[in-house]
Amino acid sequence: MARKYVIGLDYGTESGRALLVAVDNGEEVAMAIEPYPDGVIDDVLPGTGKKLEPDWALQNPRDYLYVLERVIPKVLKDSGVSGDDIIGISTDFTACTMMPIDKEGTPLCMKPEFAANPNAWVKLWKHHAAQPEADRINELAAERGESFLARYGGKISSEWFFPKALQILDEAPEVYEAADRLIEAGDWIVLQLCGEEKRNACVAGYKAIWDEGYPSPDFFRALDPRFENVVRDKMSEDIYPAGVKAGGLLPEMAKKLGLKPGTAVATGGVDAHVAVPAATVTGAGKMVMIMGTSLCHMVCGTEKKVIAGMCGVVKDGILPGFYGFEAGQTAVGDIFAWFIEHCVPASIAEEARKAGTDIHGYLGKQAAALTPGESGVLCLDWWNGNRSILVDADLTGLMMGMTLTTTPAEMYRAVLESTAFGTYTIIRQLEEGGVPITELYACGGLPGKNPLLMQIFADVTNREIKISASDQTVALGCAMWGAVAAGSAAGGYDDVTHAAAKMARLRDTVYKPNPEAHFAYEKLYAIYRRLHDLFGKGGDNAMKDLKAIKTAARRGR
């Protein structure tokens, strides 16, 4: 019997990739990456010369098909694998990235009459121009005491589905009326592949306020009478967990991709969330940290708990049969990059060059020689606001304790420690809310690059940290869901637990907490938490006052 394979399609912000994976052992056989021709559209609408307003971030849905039709044939060619041996395809996508489409599934921006209307295009996840609509939703929900607010830390983000949908209605009612569906890009790709609209629970729950149902028509009517039946008329109330077979690959799509018609197509998922089983996690109490420019924390529990400061709790949102809790830090790697770029003197860069290493490695070696607390420097990790547990984008970073003898290495270590304190705050909040966290797993770009950071995280949280073996954990996890959608009868797996047992692996390196270091960090964390509560919970609004002065000064220039 021929070896069987699956393909994970990972749609990111700037590019898309395909990872071809062997079903029997998770071997990553081939990968192809293709950038989107139009990238992130935040200046001029393509083909129109129309200038976009500030905070807009759009994409061209043609780019998604462009990538699809290139990366899959490429991994087949590079690997020598026959399309007949591919048993499943799964997709993940940034979210909320949504668009209006007609009855045939054609995005309205691809129709001549709407090509020059920005609201007919794909609104990318980081489109923030729907903030007024988000404010209206939050104010009304708070006024009415809507229970859904508590599930999302007390605020609905402008990045999410309903603010974006309401913006279309507000600014372009003709687009809203012409749309047969408002749909997530991830669900649209599934529709293109198999001809079936099967909306996934992950994005519905975390980005569209779904909790085995949506908010009532009465709530939407109170926002705008025209919005009353947005769910009935423009969406779907049929929601499916990960790993469900959405349908079989359409013959015309199979021909373009070099695959066989009827190949299993899985329901979609959000990029971070699909990675969890690829880190070997298939049950409750094990937190997966996707560590890169920002940090996403995911953990499953057996009971629904409403915990302040979480990004959401969704049944079947991460793993079928569990409640998935999501939290996050808006900047981690981005803070380190900022520090290296703006706070390190040229002399350090030259010393690093002479030592044959980069600045991170050079400072990391010096910082590793310090003991916890030795620098006397402490930071609040809010360079890009705070997602969890304060849910406040207007908070800013803070560094204190510097003297005339403070070194770049001491400051660098304090920055690393601050991000670990941010994660520790999230863990404590979850556990105090009744969600135990027994183990930590890490994946993403940072764990393999910064061993000092990982040891600090272990010491601060007082937990062992295991590292995913794959450098493409998201795409691998995505592919695993394709194997589940295919099922054992086709050579795949009937559930994600069996898939993970065969296809997911961990590195040999395990970061174990040092009890003495943790004892020292508890003292530092107590100070961190005092500052966290002072500046983050309204005790002192100095950060917001400074930000307001800055904004006013720039407007007055």
Where would I find each of the regions flagged by the language model?
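Gly/Ser/Thr-rich active-site cleft segment
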Residues: Y11-T13, N138-G269, F336, L380-R387, ...
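Conserved phosphate-binding catalytic cores of ATP/NTP-utilizing and phosphoryl-transfer enzymes
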Residues: M1-A2, L250-L259, G269-K286
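A polyampholytic, Gly/Pro-enriched intrinsically disordered region
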Residues: K50-A57, Q131-I156, G285-V288, V484-A501
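Glycine/Thr-rich phosphate-binding loops that ligate phosphate moieties of nucleotide
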Residues: M1-D43, R62, D84-N138, E174, ...
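Stable alpha-helical structural segments in soluble proteins, enriched in small hydrophobic residues
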Residues: V67, V71-S79, I189, V276-A279, ...
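Phosphate/pyrophosphate-binding loops at sites that engage ATP/ADP/AMP, CoA/4′-phosphopantetheine
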Residues: L68-I87, A172-V175, F219, L223-R232, ...
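N-terminal phosphate-binding loop and adjacent alpha-helix
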Residues: I33-V81, L124
